[in-house]
Regions:
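Polar/charged side chains located within well-ordered beta-strands of beta-rich proteins
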Residues: 20, 49, 97, 140, ...
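Acyl-donor-binding surface of acyltransferase catalytic domains
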Residues: 69, 85-175, 309-313
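Conserved donor-binding loop and adjoining core beta-sheet/short helix segment
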Residues: 10-13, 20-118, 227-228, 232-249, ...
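Active-site/acyl-donor-binding loops of N-acyltransferases
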Residues: 129-149, 222, 272, 277-317
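A mid-sequence, solvent-exposed acidic-amphipathic segment
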Residues: 197-230, 235
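Short amphipathic alpha-helix that is part of the acyltransferase structural core
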Residues: 1-39, 45, 51-54, 58, ...
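Extended hydrophobic/aromatic segments used for targeting, binding, or gating
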Residues: 233-251, 259-269, 273-283
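Conserved acetyl-CoA-binding loop-helix of GNAT-fold acetyltransferases
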Residues: 89-102, 253, 259-272, 295, ...
Length: 317
């Protein structure tokens, strides 16, 4: 029968997780992949995954197109594609891409996009097929031992204007579950300015709740929010990213409250929490368009340790 591309099936999870771990540069096991897929809502977002298999039906690579829940656009599809290193340069990736391109055509997709590291097989593969870099993300890391902490002067600068800093946990304790939706709305509003591949749209409330409240990695007592009276105006969200490592999800301030030191105070409050709880590092990611955030991170001693490009292919033209 030879090599062929077929729909992804239940028996493919182990091989898929192994190949995806290599292709995506992060450890993925079959159980995690199943759990992630179980949370996908096919009634709201389209997704297709295929695998290339050998004569014995063993996966050699995979491909996926999907609508991104955090950047909903019915004509924009995000792509994932990976081939087992032992099977590369045999036309397998090309066969997978041909199948994905056909499926994109059926859906009348206008844009295909993905992230790719520099000088990788993936980058070479996609640029040969017309994908163009349109944005770039920078990974930044701060050692907690020497990280700046809140100062009386900074606290006074912010609080003297009526701004108060608290946490998601404290707000929830004080106001109950009804307090969660306004914080989610703030998170959604701040994301609108975070340029990347496509226009940001609100993360579904259930996903935000899992990420920041109920998940094992969630840290509601390190999720800092700024309030002007009863109005939520700034946020810096954090999750566990390892035994002693944290990851900032988003730091943002509503437009009318910027350039007042709020984002800086939120960030150094995170530093103080991390230091008090024995964390060694904080990781974050920022796109090149977010010049103000890059400048803030630079002033707080976050070096850029890696970067990768965001690529798009315009379809149908």
């Amino acid at each position: 029968m030879g090599r062929r591309v077929r729909p992804f099936a239940e028996q493919d999870y182990t091989a898929y997780a192994r190949i995806a771990s290599i292709a995506q540069g992060e450890r993925i096991n079959a159980a995690e992949a199943r759990a992630t897929d179980a949370r996908w809502d096919p009634t709201r977002y389209d997704r297709l995954r295929v695998v290339a298999v050998d004569e014995e039906d063993a996966p050699l690579g995979y491909g996926e197109i999907r609508q991104e829940p955090s950047r909903v656009d019915p004509r924009r599809y995000f792509i994932r594609l990976g081939v087992d290193p032992a099977s590369r340069r045999r036309g397998i990736g090309a066969a997978i891409w041909e199948r994905l391109a056909t499926e994109l055509g059926k859906r009348r997709a206008e844009v295909a996009c993905l992230w790719a590291f520099d000088a990788t097989a993936c980058q070479t593969f996609i640029t040969k097929r017309g994908f163009v870099e349109v944005t770039r993300t920078y990974a930044q890391v701060r050692a907690i031992a020497s990280a700046p902490l809140p100062t009386p002067a900074l606290e006074e600068r912010v609080t003297s204007t009526g701004i108060q800093i608290t946490t998601l946990a404290a707000v929830r304790d004080a106001l109950g579950e009804d307090a969660l939706e306004p914080v989610w709305e703030l998170h959604s509003a701040c994301r609108l300015d975070h340029a990347a591949l496509g226009r940001a749209t609100p993360q579904p409330f259930a996903e935000w709740l899992s990420d920041n409240v109920t998940d094992a990695a969630a840290l509601p007592d390190a999720y800092f929010v700024a309030l002007d009276g009863a109005r939520y105006v700034g946020v810096s969200s954090v999750r566990r990213d390892g035994e002693d490592t944290l990851r900032i999800g988003i730091t943002g301030v509503l437009p009318g409250y910027r350039r007042r030191g709020i984002a800086r105070l939120l960030t150094v409050r995170v530093h103080a929490w991390a230091k008090a709880h024995g964390s060694s590092e904080i990781h974050t990611e920022t796109t090149k368009e977010s010049t103000a955030m890059l400048a803030l991170n630079d002033s707080l001693g976050y070096p850029i340790v890696a970067s990768w490009g965001g690529y798009e292919l315009r379809l149908g033209g």
